[in-house]
Amino acid sequence: MVENIGNGSAELVSYAKLNLYLDVLGKRSDEYHEIVGLFQTISLHDTLTVEICDGGFYLESNVALPSDNTIKRAWEMFRKNTGEEFGLKVTLKKKVPVGSGLGGGSSNAAAILRYLGEVFKIPLEDLLNIAAQVGSDVPFFLYGGTALVRGRGEIVEKLEDIEGYSVNLFFPGIHSSTKEMYLSLTPEMYRKGPGRVEELHRAYLERDYEKIRKLSYNVFEKVFLEKHPEVMYGLRNFGDGSIVKMMTGSGSAFFALYPLDEGNYPFVGGV
């Protein structure tokens, strides 16, 4: 979402995501893993104020970020792929926890690409190609809402948006490394989920809570809890009365699913 605020700058909203389903099907020859997942954006979001400028890249943030952050990579890859020469000033107000599995960094990158695409009139197909070069989850965030995601994350099939749900979040304050979590997987852990992602999507649309509980899955949850058993204590009283409680992404955040008016963060539709 882009909102012009004058003085040549714009304000971007960058939503977090949940993995309502996430399984790893195997390791590819390019060292990435083949995944299948049901992704969903929620109302928790970061805010970016951006301005095209002369010169280089400038970033102010309320949290520490690595020098090779996703926002800078998005700017670099956009310039490389389009041939456009411009500088960029970004002020980031981050609310999505870093290392939580909620996709904050990927969402930030997608917000930048979407904004630059509007400024320089770049088609969505080209933006998706650039997004895949920035990070595996970035293409999904160009759509938002509900989507079936495959490949290493770059194959995004937009689905009918799921409405009428909200979540509460539990973040144990642990930065979970996506790379480390993937390295922790062994071949016998592949393809262990129910595999019926379209059926899970339909269960959400039909409010079939029993089937939602039955088909929800995250391959990383067991691995994460084995690495961090202390998190179980924090989860004991989290999600009481929820439809389902599970981890998102490669951790470390967990979500508890509720009907729309009972959780803090409603599901958000896509573009």
Curated annotation (Swiss-Prot):
For this UniProt record, the keywords arranged alphabetically read as follows: ATP-binding, Isoprene biosynthesis, Kinase, Nucleotide-binding, Transferase
Q: Which GO terms describe its molecular function?
A: 4-(cytidine 5'-diphospho)-2-C-methyl-D-erythritol kinase activity; ATP binding
Does the record carry Kinase as a key word? Answer: yes
**Pfam families, from UniProt?**
GHMP_kinases_N (PF00288)
Q: Which reaction does it catalyse?
A: 4-CDP-2-C-methyl-D-erythritol + ATP = 4-CDP-2-C-methyl-D-erythritol 2-phosphate + ADP + H(+)
Q: Which residues bind ATP?
A: P97, V98, G99, S100, G101, L102, G103, G104, G105, S106, S107
* SUPFAM superfamilies registered for this protein in UniProt: GHMP Kinase, C-terminal domain, Ribosomal protein S5 domain 2-like
Look at the named UniProt entry and state the broad enzyme category this protein falls under: transferase
Pathway recorded for this protein: Isoprenoid biosynthesis; isopentenyl diphosphate biosynthesis via DXP pathway; isopentenyl diphosphate from 1-deoxy-D-xylulose 5-phosphate: step 3/6
Under InterPro entries, the record lists: GHMP_kinase_C_sf, GHMP_kinase_N_dom, IspE, Ribosomal_Su5_D2-typ_SF, Ribsml_uS5_D2-typ_fold_subgr
Annotated active site residues, numbered on this chain, are: K17, D137
Q: What is its EC number?
A: 2.7.1.148
GO BP, sorted A to Z: isopentenyl diphosphate biosynthetic process, methylerythritol 4-phosphate pathway; terpenoid biosynthetic process
Residues annotated as coiled-coil are none
Record keywords: Ligase included? no
Per the record, the similarity remark reads: Belongs to the GHMP kinase family. IspE subfamily.
What does the record give as the function of this protein? Answer: Catalyzes the phosphorylation of the position 2 hydroxy group of 4-diphosphocytidyl-2C-methyl-D-erythritol.
Q: Which protein are we looking at?
A: 4-diphosphocytidyl-2-C-methyl-D-erythritol kinase
What organism, scientifically named, is this protein from?
Answer: Thermotoga petrophila (strain ATCC BAA-488 / DSM 13995 / JCM 10881 / RKU-1)
Species lineage: Bacteria, Thermotogati, Thermotogota, Thermotogae, Thermotogales
